[in-house]
Curated annotation (Swiss-Prot):
Segments forming a coiled coil: 15-39
SMART domains: ARM (SM00185)
Gene coding for it: Tmco6
Protein name: Transmembrane and coiled-coil domain-containing protein 6
Species this protein is from: Mus musculus (Mouse)
UniProt keyword terms in alphabetical order: Coiled coil, Membrane, Transmembrane, Transmembrane helix
Length: 494
C-alpha cells in the first residue's frame, strides 16, 4: 500500500512538473513576442504666430531660384533683420517636401546654412537651426543625410545656455537619428552619448523631455544592442534616468514617460540588465507604480496610462531575469500593495483603455509565476473574482488571466483549497466553448492542475457536464493529449 501511494505521488508530481515546464516554454516564446518596440515617430516644433502665417498654411513651395535668393539674402543681406526675414521665408518653404528636395540638390546650400548656424548672431543661429529642424522632419533618408555636416554643431550646442535652443537641437537630432543609419554612425564617434549624459543634468523640463525623445529614437536603432546600448550602460544615463523616475513632488509625468520608454528599449535589448538592477531599477519602478496607482484613485483622467504602460513593461521584462530568491529580497516586491496597485490599474484600463489590460496582466503573471507570496496576496485580497470577471473581454486577456490562475493553482493543495468552492470552475468551463485553441488549451491545463490538487473540483466538473464539454473538443487534434489526461484524472477522482 505504501509503495503504491509513493508511486502515485511520484506520477502526480511528474505531471505537475511537466505542465509547469510546458507552460514556461510557452511563456518564454510569449516574452520574446512581447519585447515589442514602440513605433518610431518624429516631432516637430513650430512656433509661428497666426499673424506671421497670415491665416494660411505656412508651407510654401519654393523653386530653385527662390531658394538661392533666400540663401543669398540670409548670408549677405544688408542688415540682420533682412537676413532673419530671408531665413524665415526659407524655413516656411522647407516645410514643403518638394522644396526640401530642391534645397538638398542645390550645390552649397547646406554649407551656407551651416555657416549661418555657426555664426555669432543668436537670432540667425536660431532661424538656421529651425531650417534644419524642418529638414529633419522629412521622411526621406536622403534629406536626413544631407544634414550630416550640421550634426557635430548640433551636438556642440547641447552644452549651450539657451534651453530653447538646446530643446530644438535635441528634437532635430532625434528626428535625424530615426531616418538614417549614416547619421547615427556619424553621431556616435562625435560623442552623442556623453553629450546626452551632460544634457540629463539640465534643470529644464522641456530639455529633459526632448532628451528623452532623442535618446529613445537612438535606442530603437537596429544596431543599438551592439553599438549603442553598451556605451549608454557605461555612462551615467541609466542612473540619472531612474532618479528622474522616482516618485515624489518633483516627478514630472512627461519626463518620466520619455525615460520609461528609454528603459523599456534598454531592457528589451537584454544587453546587460544587471546594470539597471544594480542601480535599483526594480524598487524604483515598483514604487513609481504604487505612486501612480494612488494618483489614479485621486484623479479621474490625467493621461497616467501613457506612463503606466512603459513602467508595466519595464517591470514585467526585468522580472523575467531576476531569480525568485533575489526578487524576494526586494522589500518593494514583497509588498502586497503592488498587487493591489495592479488591480487599480486593471480597473482603470477596463474603463479608459481596455487595450492596455494585457500590460497589467502580463506583470501579474510574472509576479505570480515563481512567488507564493504574490499568489497569497491574490487570495488574501479577494482578487480572484475580479480576475475572473476579465475572462470574457478578449482572447488575449482571457489567456493571461488563465495563466495567472495556473500560477496560483500550481502552488499546491493549500492554494487550491482557498479557491474552492467558488466561481472558478464554472468560469473556466465557459472558456472551453471558445474558438481559440490556445485559450482552450490553457483552460484544460488549469483544470488538470486543479483536479490534481483538489479532487472535489473533479467531482463537481463531472456533475456540471464537464465530460460532455470535453467531447465537443474531440476534433481538435492538438488538444487530444490534454483532453485524455483530464478525462483520466476526472474519472479517477470522480
Amino acid at each position: 500500500m505504501w509503495n503504491r501511494r509513493q508511486g502515485r505521488l511520484r506520477t502526480l508530481a511528474f505531471g505537475v512538473e511537466e505542465l509547469r515546464r510546458r507552460r514556461r516554454e510557452r511563456e518564454a516564446a510569449l516574452r520574446k513576442a512581447r519585447r515589442e518596440q514602440q513605433l518610431v515617430s518624429k516631432r516637430l516644433l513650430r512656433e509661428d504666430a497666426p499673424e506671421e502665417v497670415g491665416g494660411q498654411s505656412a508651407a510654401v513651395l519654393l523653386g530653385e531660384a527662390e531658394v538661392q535668393q533666400f540663401l543669398r539674402l540670409a548670408q549677405r543681406g544688408t542688415d540682420e533683420k533682412e537676413r532673419e526675414k530671408a531665413l524665415v521665408s526659407l524655413r516656411r518653404g522647407l516645410q514643403h517636401p518638394d522644396t526640401q528636395q530642391t534645397f538638398i540638390r542645390l550645390e552649397g546650400s547646406m554649407r551656407t546654412l551651416v555657416g549661418i548656424l555657426t555664426s555669432n548672431r543668436a537670432l540667425l543661429q536660431l532661424e538656421a537651426a529651425r531650417c534644419l529642424h524642418e529638414l529633419s522632419h522629412s521622411e526621406q533618408s536622403a534629406v536626413a543625410e544631407a544634414c550630416l555636416p550640421a550634426t557635430s554643431y548640433l551636438l556642440t550646442y547641447l552644452s549651450g545656455h539657451s534651453s530653447d535652443f538646446i530643446e530644438l537641437c535635441l528634437y532635430t537630432l532625434g528626428n535625424l537619428i530615426v531616418e538614417s543609419e549614416a547619421v547615427r554612425k556619424q553621431l556616435l564617434p562625435q560623442g552623442i552619448v556623453p553629450a546626452f549624459a551632460a544634457c540629463i543634468q539640465s534643470p529644464h523640463v522641456a530639455v529633459l523631455e526632448a532628451l528623452g525623445y532623442a535618446l529613445s529614437q537612438l535606442l530603437q536603432a537596429k544596431e543599438a544592442p551592439e553599438k549603442i546600448i553598451p556605451s549608454i550602460l557605461d555612462s551615467s544615463l541609466p542612473q540619472q534616468m531612474l532618479w528622474l523616475m522616482q516618485p515624489g513632488p518633483k516627478l514630472n509625468l512627461g519626463v518620466a514617460m520619455e525615460f520609461a520608454w528609454c528603459l523599456h528599449y534598454i531592457i528589451c535589448s537584454q544587453v546587460n540588465n544587471a546594470v539597471l538592477l544594480t542601480h535599483g531599477a526594480l524598487p524604483t519602478l515598483a514604487l513609481l507604480l504604487l505612486d501612480l496607482a494612488g494618483t489614479v484613485q485621486r484623479m479621474d483622467d490625467v493621461g497616467l496610462e501613457l506612463l503606466a504602460c512603459p513602467v508595466l513593461r519595464c517591470l514585467s521584462n526585468l522580472l523575467t531575469e531576476v531569480p525568485a530568491e533575489v526578487m524576494g529580497q526586494q522589500m518593494e516586491l514583497r509588498d502586497e500593495r503592488l498587487v493591489a496597485a495592479l488591480f487599480i490599474f486593471l480597473q482603470f484600463f477596463l474603463q479608459k483603455q481596455p487595450a492596455l489590460l494585457p500590460e497589467g496582466l502580463w506583470l501579474l503573471n510574472n509576479l505570480t509565476a515563481n512567488s507564493p507570496t504574490f499568489c497569497t496576496s491574490l487570495l488574501s485580497l479577494d482578487l480572484i473574482e475580479p480576475l475572473l470577471q476579465l475572462l470574457p473581454l478578449s482572447n488575449a486577456v482571457c489567456m493571461l488571466v488563465l495563466t495567472v490562475l495556473c500560477n496560483v493553482v500550481e502552488k499546491g493543495p493549500a492554494y487550491c483549497q482557498r479557491l474552492w468552492p467558488g466561481p472558478l470552475l464554472s468560469c473556466v468551463l465557459n472558456t472551453l466553448a471558445l474558438s481559440d485553441t490556445e485559450v482552450v488549451g490553457q483552460s484544460l491545463e488549469l483544470l488538470q492542475l486543479l483536479f490534481l490538487h483538489q479532487p472535489e473540483a473533479a467531482r463537481a466538473f463531472l456533475q456540471q457536464s464537464g465530460l460532455q464539454a470535453l467531447e465537443k473538443l474531440q476534433e481538435e487534434t492538438q488538444l487530444q493529449e490534454r483532453i485524455h489526461a483530464l478525462q483520466q484524472i476526472a474519472a479517477t477522482h470522480g
